Structures are given as structure tokens and as C-alpha cells.
């Protein structure tokens, strides 16, 4: 037996390159090992580990890892080959059939050839003709601003790109269709990110995945040659099935199976080898959809039967924030996934006794509920109802009659406990009067019973229905429901909060019952279960209801209780403190008016010079100002809570209305100004900063050290602010400031050199308008000329001068000055400054940081990067050679292949840049190690097309070339 295996292995080594892996063959055809022969003769347990390694190597597979891993790798290879052969055979048969049909058709006297484009609109053909013409393409895009943000430079589909661009799918589709050398998708990790991102089950997403599979398969003729060897779905079928299941993407998995016509046995094997059984144990709504789908096409291996929902979060299925249609689908997926009748029988056999009477009772209840739901027709559900949340439906439920629906077919919910469970939900024209709340309750009850029978029957203590289930479906008094909270939920603070808020906001509960609840809490009826220090939970529930009647009743009862208490014993806070503590919950003007008319003397936020106004929601500030102005009172603002989220917005409001606000800042405000700018940039509040700087003059220059640490993460958020800062700053004024640095460099020691410069931003009506236009495009807040340039009179308030600001100063480092100019598309100005002041800008202490990889990598485009490279080549010196090398490293890391192709096409540049410096070639700039590092960066970034281009062109030794190629093979 061993000798026979040895012969087979030798045959593999001699013949494995031949493509004859037909799974239906009875033996080894022409000496080749087939899937059946492999499974028959090479058992994972008895086969020698060394023999498996030889087979793996002969097939071009990795041979490292444990024995079972190597075995699974070989098995997966054969499964993929089977799918590929089936796909090829199908296409061959279709081509032969098509050829026969064409031969049978009468031949025209003169042949006419028509080029057709599948799935492409006629007008789109002209677009692609322009798009693929590099000369026209570059000419068009050279006229666009913000070239560094052009999508044609995007390399790789990472989370930043996929989540940061709302049209990321369209960009990928355009890039695939363009079929140019600059492909966004570079490797399998990019594909995995795509699978993790696009999961919606609609026609657009399904079409997207079909395009993806057609381009990245071994039969594709459109794919660039360099990518076809690294990404082929049909060469790695089992691994892609694993990735789609683990990323819980039903749409991709469904289209993948259909596109490549993968049979159930291949899917079963792939799941068994690569997907852990526990994946389906932690059951979610979306995982259930995949599980039921695989089950419906008979593709679930016996080892992966759905575990009994051990790690399932019941609250996710029963959330009242879910849409009604999701509740129906949850019910469907749960019931379809499990044969409850079979589970009952298995439990009886396992225990060798009849099932516990209580458990049997629950199974019977569930069966009864399923039968009841089978009788429900869904014609009374409108699209609005199906797309509404359960919470909203329960707050507006009335008996509903039959309503118009988009479908006219008739069927019912059909569910049984038999192995052939079936469920359909369509519409019927039958007239019906059914209470929607009762229907929702039946679905909830069924899901609860299902989980109890499947998971919690062995330990009833662990099972409890959500609190909202009792609050919405149990027809009990408020007192009775509160007892349930205490008995079933042990009276936790969170449950008390949920209970009080739900009761007080429920429009279906009578006001008298709510009044009774308030009275019972204040009279200590629940003192044993509701501690006094937890009263703030109840207070918050009352004020958050924003119900004037409830709040008024509550405050009057508090007042009565306080009158009955001695001065030394004050159980509850004062009325004024209560209202002030919860004023942030006020969400409508009527509540403010209510306090103003009835509790003005008690309310702290109606006092003169109060600071509590900062807690009132910004949407209500204008009405609040009107009330304060009507009684001649003012609010106070200092910088004590400068880090609050809306502080700068409130400061801008206060600056514009000095009759209502008094502002007082001492010298410490200069210290916190940087943090204020930083926090508002992170919160996308660039307009708030611009408003502030336009209406308040700092007595010291604004330091922009924040740019040093925060520029990279917040580049797009800062763009409007940067435009505002540099709008009226010319390159000549920057040159003047840099000349001062140059003088200091010549005459002072290094320690005395100040690497920062101070610039002045001039504010004019034109500046304001420009800023406003830009801001309007990028944010929802609009800024007008009027509110930027008022008030007219200046006023000193400590370290600030409030009033119309004509200009302000700021300091910025030379490095960040260059970065800002770059992001404003003022690269021509950078080149101008290079020429005028090379001794300053090319000073390693200043400029080297700008060209460091971590800085320029995040902002560079191929367009500008090539511009810098060409400039450094034309101005080579001891400093610029280092900057040139850094730019080449970035181009390699980002996969800008065209930059290197342009260098190679130039005989002079290629000799300087991409040939190794030796004794015989002193004209070259870089030694072997530096050039090797450039190639390694492209390999580590999985840009293999560029890697192979550089390996072939650079005159590395044979040893170095082999070493680099091995790095590529390991990452493929």
C-alpha cells in the first residue's frame, strides 16, 4: 500500500501541471491524482505527514503547519479545481451549442461585425473611450482642484475608503469597468473588506457581486494580467465560502454559489474544513438567514447543525426598536431553523423518560401559537406598518381593518413543527378586523416560548421576558406591573428607570394612574424596593416626559411635602434646584413658558447673572433669550466649562447679544484656546471656530500647534478652517516671513532659531463670503456676513476684545505651513518657495519632517508626488536626495506603478534612480539596500505588479531577486 502511494506521489510530481482533475474518473488518469483517489488512498489519520507535504508542494501549495491543516489545504485545492472544471465545461458546452446554432443559420453575403457592450448604456461607451485615453484623461483632470482627493489615485479598499465615501461601491464599479492598470482592488484582503461592507440584499448589490466575480475569475478576459494570478475566486472556493459566512454576508454568499454553480457537496466540505461549528452557535438575526439558506440547499454538514442558541442575545430578537417586518422575519427564521418536534423526541430518548410536564406544556403552547399565526392573513399590514418600529406601532395601535397593499395574491402564514417547516407571508384581499397589538403579542409570545424550549428549559431562572413585554402586553394596573419589576428584575436601577419612563410616556395609560404612581413614590409606598438615593431616577423620568400636567402635579406634591417638613429635615431638593438640575431635558418652548409663568421666582435659570442657562438645549436658546430680555435679566458666561460640547456655540451666541449676556474671561483663556479649537475641529464644528475668530480678537496670536498632532486624522475636517486661515495670505507674504528665519539661521545659534512663523489673516466682506460658500458645501451650519462682522462696537472682556475683527494673527510651524499649502492645492506656491528660499525649506531641521513618510504619505497623490520627484531630480543636492528617496518610498508603498513606469521610460532618470550604485556606476544615487527597501515596501503593501516590475528592471544580484520573489510567494 505504501509503495503504491509512493508511485502515485511520484506521478503527481511528474504530471501535476496537466489539467485533468475530473472528479468522476474511477482512477488515476494519466498518472494524475483526483479528488476521489485522494480521499480513498490518503486518509488524514493514516497517511504519513511527509507524504502529505510532498503532495502539497507538488500542487504548488504551502506545506507548513500541522498534519490536518496540510490535509485540509490539499482537499480544498481539489474542491476548487472541481468547481473550476465544472464552470469551464459549462462554458465550453455553451460555446459549442452557440457555434452549432450559428452554423445552422443562413450566412449573409457580406459579414457585418458589431461590437456590443454588456450591461453598458450607449452614452457610457463614450465615457469609457475618454476615460481610457490617458492623454485626454490627464488633461481633463488637470483642470480640477483638490487633485489629491481624486479617486483615480485610490489604492486598496480599506475601512477608511469604504466607510468614508458614500459612493464607494460606485467608485469600485467604475474602476473595474475601466479595466486600467490602476486597479483599486489589489489583493484578497481588499475583497474581504468589500464583503464585510456591502451586505444589503438588493438588485444593486447583487449586480455588484456578479460583476466582481466575473472580473476576478480564471475565465475572465478583462482582468489585467498582473492581478489574475493573485485574485481568482474559483481558485480558492472553500476559503471564500468561509470568509462570506464569517463576515455574515448572505448576499455575497448567495451570488457566489449561483455564479460559480457550486454544488452542495463542495459547500459542505468547505464549511466542514474551514468554518467552526461555533460560528452558528452564537446566533444572530443575519446568521440565521445564512443558516436557513444553506439548509434549504442541503449544504449544512452534520457537524454544523445549529447549536441550541446557547450564546443568543434574546433582547436583540425582541427589541421594541426593531421594525415590525423584522419581528416577523425573526419568527420565521427561528422556527425554520429548528425542528422542535424532533428536538422533543431527542430529549425524551436522551433522558430515557418522558419529558418533564412543564417543558411539554411549553412545547404545546408554542405549537398552539404557531397554529394561530398560520391563520393570520397579512393584508391588514400596510407598508408603513411593516416599516414602523414595534414601539411606534404599540403607541398608536387601534383595531385595524383591511388596507390597500401592493400585492394582490393570497396566502397565509404557514408553520408546522414537521421537518418540512414552511412559512409564507403575502397579502390577501379578505376583509378582517384584527387588533395589531394582539398580532405583535403573538409573535413575541412565540419567540419567547421558542427560546425557552430551545435554551432555558433546563434552568428556568435564567429565562425572563423583556420588561417591555410586560409593560406593553400585560393588562394590569401600574401597581401590579411595578410588583413584576421588583419580583422578576430584583428592582435594579436600570429597570426602575425603564419602568418609570415607559409608564409616564405611555399615551395609552390614563393620567390618573400616572398621578397615582407619582403620589405612591413620593409617599414612600415603594420604600422597601426603591431606595431614597434612587429618587433621581424617578425625578428624571418625570421631567423627561415633558408633560406639563405631570410636571405640574409632581412639583405641587413636592411643595406640599416640603411644607409639612421642618426646616432641619429636607427630604427632597428645593423646587428651583429640581428644575435647574433637569432643565437640559426640556425639549419644547411650552415647557419654558410654563416655568416662566408659574415658577419664575424659584427657577435658577431665570435669575440675573445665572450660569445654568448653559444647560438649556441650543434649539431653545432664542426663545429663552426672549424671556430673559423681557424681564431685564442677563446670563453670565465664563470659561470654566470650556470643554463642554457646545461651549463655543454658546460663546458665539453670547458675543452677538451683549444685551442678554455678560462675558468675563481672565488671562487663562489663552491657555485653553488651543484645546477649544482642537475639540471643535474633531466635532466637525469648523464654522463655530470661524465665527469666533471673526467676532473676538485674541490679545495673543492663536497657536496652531494642534495641527502638529491632529492634522492627519482630521484633514478633511480641517480643510474649511485652513481655507479661512490662508484665504488672503499670499506666497510673497510667506516668503517675507521665511526670510526672517533665514537671517536667524545665518546669524544665530541653532537653539535661537525659531522654526515657527507668525502670519496675519485679514477678514473682509469678500473673505467672509468665500468662507461661507465653502462651509455651506461641507457642513449643515451656514455662516453669513452679518453674523461674522457684528457687533460694531468693540468691548474688552479680559483676554478677548469682542467686536468686529478685521484681522488676527496665528503661529504655525514651517512643516505644517507646507502641509496646509499642499491641501489648498497651492503646490505651485510651494515650488515658488523652494526656488526662492532653498536654504530654509531644504534645511533638514524644517523640511525633512514634511517629506517623512508618515506625513506626506497621508496627503500625497500620484500627480503631486511625481511633481515633487521631478523637482528633486532637477535640483539634486545633499538634502534633496533624501527627500527624493522618501518620495520614491511613498510611491512604492502606495502602488503608484505609473510613476515608476515613467522613470523607467526615461533613460537618464532610470540610470540615476533605479540602478544600483557601484564602483563602475557612480552616477546612480542609491545602493542595493536602499533600492531593495523600495521594492520591499511595494511587496508589504501587496502591490505585486509594481514589485515584479522593479525586480525585473533593477540590476539586483540573482540571490537578491530570488529572495524578493520568495517574499511575494509567501504573501500570495
Swiss-Prot record:
Residues 44-78 form the SAP domain. Residues 1-30 are annotated as: Disordered. The keyword Transport does not apply. GO terms for molecular function: DNA binding. Residues 1-19 have a biased composition (Basic and acidic residues). This is UPF0746 protein DDB_G0280785. InterPro entries: SAP_dom, UPF0746_actin_org.
Amino acid at each position: 500500500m505504501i509503495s503504491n502511494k509512493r508511485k502515485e506521489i511520484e506521478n503527481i510530481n511528474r504530471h501535476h501541471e496537466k489539467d485533468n482533475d475530473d472528479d468522476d474518473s474511477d482512477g488515476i488518469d494519466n498518472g494524475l491524482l483526483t479528488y476521489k483517489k485522494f480521499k480513498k488512498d490518503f486518509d488524514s489519520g493514516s497517511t504519513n505527514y511527509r507524504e502529505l507535504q510532498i503532495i502539497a508542494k507538488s500542487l504548488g501549495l504551502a506545506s507548513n503547519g500541522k498534519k490536518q491543516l496540510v490535509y485540509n489545504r490539499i482537499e480544498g485545492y481539489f474542491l476548487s479545481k472541481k468547481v473550476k472544471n465544472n464552470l469551464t465545461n459549462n462554458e465550453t458546452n455553451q460555446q459549442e451549442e452557440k457555434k452549432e446554432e450559428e452554423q445552422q443559420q443562413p450566412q449573409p453575403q457580406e459579414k457585418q461585425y458589431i461590437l456590443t457592450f454588456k450591461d453598458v448604456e450607449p452614452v457610457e461607451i463614450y465615457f469609457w473611450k475618454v476615460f481610457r485615453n490617458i492623454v485626454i484623461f490627464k488633461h481633463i483632470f488637470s483642470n480640477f482642484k483638490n487633485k489629491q482627493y481624486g479617486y483615480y489615485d485610490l489604492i486598496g479598499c480599506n475601512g477608511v475608503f469604504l466607510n468614508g465615501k458614500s459612493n464607494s461601491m460606485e467608485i469600485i464599479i467604475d474602476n473595474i469597468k475601466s479595466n486600467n492598470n490602476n486597479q483599486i482592488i489589489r489583493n484578497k484582503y481588499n475583497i474581504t473588506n468589500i464583503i464585510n461592507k456591502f451586505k444589503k440584499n438588493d438588485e444593486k448589490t447583487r449586480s455588484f457581486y456578479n460583476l466582481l466575480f466575473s472580473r476576478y475569475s480564471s475565465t475572465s478576459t478583462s482582468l489585467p494580467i498582473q492581478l489574475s494570478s493573485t485574485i481568482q475566486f474559483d481558485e480558492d472556493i472553500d476559503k471564500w465560502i468561509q470568509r462570506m459566512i464569517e463576515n455574515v454576508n448572505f448576499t455575497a454568499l448567495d451570488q457566489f454559489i449561483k455564479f460559480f454553480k457550486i454544488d452542495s457537496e463542495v459547500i459542505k466540505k468547505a464549511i466542514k474544513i474551514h468554518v467552526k461549528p461555533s460560528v452558528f452557535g452564537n446566533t444572530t438575526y443575519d446568521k440565521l438567514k445564512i443558516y436557513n439558506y444553506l439548509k434549504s440547499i442541503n449544504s449544512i454538514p452534520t457537524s454544523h447543525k445549529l447549536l441550541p442558541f446557547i450564546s443568543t442575545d434574546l433582547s436583540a430578537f425582541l427589541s421594541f426598536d426593531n421594525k415590525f417586518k423584522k419581528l416577523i422575519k425573526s419568527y420565521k427564521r427561528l422556527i425554520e431553523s429548528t425542528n422542535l418536534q424532533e428536538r422533543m423526541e431527542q430529549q425524551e430518548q436522551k433522558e430515557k423518560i418522558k419529558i418533564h410536564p412543564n417543558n411539554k406544556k411549553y412545547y404545546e403552547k408554542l405549537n398552539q401559537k404557531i397554529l394561530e399565526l398560520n391563520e393570520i392573513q397579512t393584508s391588514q399590514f400596510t407598508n408603513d406598518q411593516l416599516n414602523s418600529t414595534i414601539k411606534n406601532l404599540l403607541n398608536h395601535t387601534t383595531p385595524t381593518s383591511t388596507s390597500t397593499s401592493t400585492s394582490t395574491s393570497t396566502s397565509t402564514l404557514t408553520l408546522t413543527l414537521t421537518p418540512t417547516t414552511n412559512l409564507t407571508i403575502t397579502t390577501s384581499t379578505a376583509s378582517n378586523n384584527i387588533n395589531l397589538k394582539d398580532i405583535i403579542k403573538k409573535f413575541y409570545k412565540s419567540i419567547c416560548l421558542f427560546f425557552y424550549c430551545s435554551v432555558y428549559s433546563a434552568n428556568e431562572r435564567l429565562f425572563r421576558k423583556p420588561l417591555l413585554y410586560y409593560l406593553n402586553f400585560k393588562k394590569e394596573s401600574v401597581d401590579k406591573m411595578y410588583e413584576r419589576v421588583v419580583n422578576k428584575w430584583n428592582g435594579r436601577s436600570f429597570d426602575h428607570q425603564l419602568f418609570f419612563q415607559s409608564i409616564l410616556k405611555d399615551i395609552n395609560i390614563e393620567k390618573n394612574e400616572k398621578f397615582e404612581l407619582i403620589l405612591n413614590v413620593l409617599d414612600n409606598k415603594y420604600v422597601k424596593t426603591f431606595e431614597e438615593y434612587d429618587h433621581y431616577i424617578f425625578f428624571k423620568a418625570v421631567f423627561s416626559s415633558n408633560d406639563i400636567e405631570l410636571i405640574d402635579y409632581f412639583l405641587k406634591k413636592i411643595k406640599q411635602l416640603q411644607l409639612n417638613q421642618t426646616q432641619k429635615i429636607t427630604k427632597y431638593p428645593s423646587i428651583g434646584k429640581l428644575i435647574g438640575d433637569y432643565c437640559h431635558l426640556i425639549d419644547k418652548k411650552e415647557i419654558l413658558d410654563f416655568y416662566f409663568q408659574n415658577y419664575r421666582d424659584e427657577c435658577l435659570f431665570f435669575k440675573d447673572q445665572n450660569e445654568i442657562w448653559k444647560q438649556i438645549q441650543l434649539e431653545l436658546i432664542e426663545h429663552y433669550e426672549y424671556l430673559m430680555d423681557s424681564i431685564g435679566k442677563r446670563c453670565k458666561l465664563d470659561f470654566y466649562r470650556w470643554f463642554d460640547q457646545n461651549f463655543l456655540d454658546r460663546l458665539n451666541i453670547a458675543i452677538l447679544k451683549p444685551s442678554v449676556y455678560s462675558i468675563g474671561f481672565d488671562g487663562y483663556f489663552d491657555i485653553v484656546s488651543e484645546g477649544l479649537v482642537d475639540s471643535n475641529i474633531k466635532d466637525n464644528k469648523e464654522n463655530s471656530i470661524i465665527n469666533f475668530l471673526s467676532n473676538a480678537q485674541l490679545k495673543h496670536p492663536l497657536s496652531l500647534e494642534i495641527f502638529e498632532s491632529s492634522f492627519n486624522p482630521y484633514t478633511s475636517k480641517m480643510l474649511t478652517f485652513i481655507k479661512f486661515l490662508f484665504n488672503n495670505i499670499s506666497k510673497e507674504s510667506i516668503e517675507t516671513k521665511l526670510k526672517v528665519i533665514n537671517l536667524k539661521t545665518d546669524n544665530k545659534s541653532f537653539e535661537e532659531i525659531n522654526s515657527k512663523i507668525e502670519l496675519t489673516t485679514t477678514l473682509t466682506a469678500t473673505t467672509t463670503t468665500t468662507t461661507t460658500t465653502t462651509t455651506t458645501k461641507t457642513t449643515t451650519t451656514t455662516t453669513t456676513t452679518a453674523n461674522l462682522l457684528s457687533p460694531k462696537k468693540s468691548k474688552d472682556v479680559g483676554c478677548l476684545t469682542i467686536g468686529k475683527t478685521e484681522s488676527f494673527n496665528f503661529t504655525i510651524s514651517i512643516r505644517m505651513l507646507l502641509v496646509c499649502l499642499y491641501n489648498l492645492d497651492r503646490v505651485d506656491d510651494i515650488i515658488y518657495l523652494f526656488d526662492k528660499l532653498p536654504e530654509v525649506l531644504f534645511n533638514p531641521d524644517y523640511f525633512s519632517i514634511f517629506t517623512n513618510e508618515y506625513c506626506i504619505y497621508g496627503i500625497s497623490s500620484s500627480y503631486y508626488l511625481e511633481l515633487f520627484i521631478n523637482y528633486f531630480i532637477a535640483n539634486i543636492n545633499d538634502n534633496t536626495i533624501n527627500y527624493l528617496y522618501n518620495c520614491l518610498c511613498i510611491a512604492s508603498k502606495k502602488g503608484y506603478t505609473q510613476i515608476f513606469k515613467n522613470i523607467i521610460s526615461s533613460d537618464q532618470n532610470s540610470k540615476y534612480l533605479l540602478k544600483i550604485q557601484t564602483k563602475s556606476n557612480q552616477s546612480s544615487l542609491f545602493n542595493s539596500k536602499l533600492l531593495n527597501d523600495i521594492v520591499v515596501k511595494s511587496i508589504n503593501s501587496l502591490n505585486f505588479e509594481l514589485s515584479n516590475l522593479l525586480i525585473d528592471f533593477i540590476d539586483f544580484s540573482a540571490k537578491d531577486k530570488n529572495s524578493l520573489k520568495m517574499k511575494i510567494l509567501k504573501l500570495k
